[in-house]
């Protein structure tokens, strides 16, 4: 048998893929049908690519969880290491559960005002159907489940900020009780005001990846807890002297900082939400570069300021300087030029050094500098948006900053106070002297060093 390879589109085509006894004849679709198939295939490929990108970025943000754990474990004393590691792994699990059943619905209820909708599904429904995605003509460009995954690791990040600030004197179960409310209610409601399409989204407030929504929110909750807890024993003298309490493991703290720096590419890069065209791909690349440059600027600035202020370089200030730069650029890592990103990060690095010193002077004890890094620099980051983003307004940034801070601080203070009244939030003086590992956990991270 011979075949004429010069068939017209209208001619039948012999399908050779079937068994010999069941050869079938198919008709090649006309040009209009072929174009429709190509368009639908392009939509599906873009959807798959953007979903995969979103999931990978979320996985990078999840990797920030061990970053926080290592940083905090390095900056606390050896006798409190296992306890702070337990807090970090437990808070991540609690955040995932609470955000699944309550928080995600509160944050993305579709309400346009200050109060979110209360129509809770207590879980995730079905994901996007193929027909619906194709019919959207590209407006639905990633899986709903990928959005949940990306958002839930942000919630855990906000809670991780609190862990370091209240370290070395808080009761484990009091902290975990607060984590339930913070991740299920406090964080999602303020997040609904902007990312969820609520009141702040119409007031000119801009926060690309969460300098305020994530970082300042976590710092405000931490500040409320620190004020109720009080300082660690021996931190401040009667005459106002500040007694340094060095961390046990600087290599671990340094590793934690680098893990956070690495994970931040997902934190900021994923917030572009899309990758599957040239413009979006260029935007993600720009976000990566600006994020990196801000961290570098923050670290160098903090290192220089510490040298000028204290006479010696300070590793912990350098580590916090890098994180300060990252927090500072998070509100808008897309609009600035790379050089401006260095400057924004550098200002954050300067601020964090003076902020840590200032908090010590007023006896607000923050063992890892979390309130300074995420709170002070989070506020700076929100206003730094005005340097390069013409769509943001000063009043919008001011209103957003005040709304997020006041809501989080006041609600957190109430919740911390209730927990304090019910089960207490601070370990005893004897337990603090012995260490949280022995008092709360029963397993010491460095038994050969913490005991004789």
Residue ranges, per PLM feature:
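Short, Lys/Arg-enriched N-terminal segments with co-localized hydrophobic residues
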Residues: 4-11, 15-37
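Hydrophobic alpha-helical transmembrane bundles of multi-pass membrane proteins
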Residues: 23, 34-452
């Amino acid at each position: 048998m011979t075949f004429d390879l010069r068939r017209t589109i209208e001619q039948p085509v012999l399908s050779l893929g079937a068994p010999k006894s069941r050869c079938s004849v198919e008709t090649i679709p006309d040009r209009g049908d072929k174009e429709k198939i190509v368009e639908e295939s392009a939509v599906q490929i873009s959807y798959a690519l953007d979903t995969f990108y979103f999931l990978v970025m979320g996985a990078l943000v999840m990797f920030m969880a061990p970053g926080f754990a290592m940083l905090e474990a390095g900056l606390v004393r050896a006798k409190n290491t296992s306890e702070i590691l337990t807090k970090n792994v437990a808070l991540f699990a609690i955040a995932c559960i609470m955000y699944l059943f309550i928080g995600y619905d509160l944050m993305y209820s579709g309400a346009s005002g200050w109060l979110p909708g209360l129509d809770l599904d207590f879980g995730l429904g079905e994901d996007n159907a193929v027909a619906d995605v194709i019919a959207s003509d590209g407006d639905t460009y990633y899986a709903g489940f990928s959005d949940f995954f990306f958002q839930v690791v942000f919630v855990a990040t906000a809670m991780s900020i609190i862990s370091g600030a209240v370290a070395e004197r808080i009761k484990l179960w009091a902290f975990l009780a607060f984590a339930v409310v913070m991740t299920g209610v406090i964080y999602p409601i303020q997040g609904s005001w902007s990312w969820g399409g609520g009141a702040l989204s119409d007031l000119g407030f801009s926060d690309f990846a969460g300098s305020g929504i994530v970082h300042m929110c976590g710092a405000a909750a931490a500040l409320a807890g620190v004020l109720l807890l009080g300082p660690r024993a021996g931190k401040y003298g009667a005459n106002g002297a500040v007694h340094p309490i060095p961390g046990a493991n600087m290599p671990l703290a340094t590793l934690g900082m680098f893990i956070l720096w690495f994970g931040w590419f997902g934190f900021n890069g994923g917030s572009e939400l899309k990758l599957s065209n040239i413009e979006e791909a260029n935007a993600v690349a720009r976000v990566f570069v600006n994020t990196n440059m801000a961290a570098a600027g923050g670290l160098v600035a903090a290192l220089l300021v510490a040298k000028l202020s204290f006479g010696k370089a300070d590793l912990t200030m350098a580590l916090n300087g890098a994180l300060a730069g990252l927090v500072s650029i998070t509100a808008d890592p897309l609009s600035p030029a790379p050089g401006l990103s260095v400057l924004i990060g550098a200002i954050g690095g300067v601020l964090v050094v003076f902020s840590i010193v200032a908090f010590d002077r007023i006896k607000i004890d923050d063992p890892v500098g979390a309130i300074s890094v995420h709170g002070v620099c989070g506020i700076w980051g929100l206003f730094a948006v005005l340097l390069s983003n013409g769509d943001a307004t000063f009043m919008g940034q001011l209103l957003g900053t005040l709304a997020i801070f006041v809501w989080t601080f006041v609600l957190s203070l109430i919740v911390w106070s209730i927990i304090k009244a019910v089960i207490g939030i601070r370990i005893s003086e004897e337990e603090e002297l012995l260490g949280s590992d022995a008092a709360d956990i029963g397993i010491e991270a460095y038994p050969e060093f913490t005991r004789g």
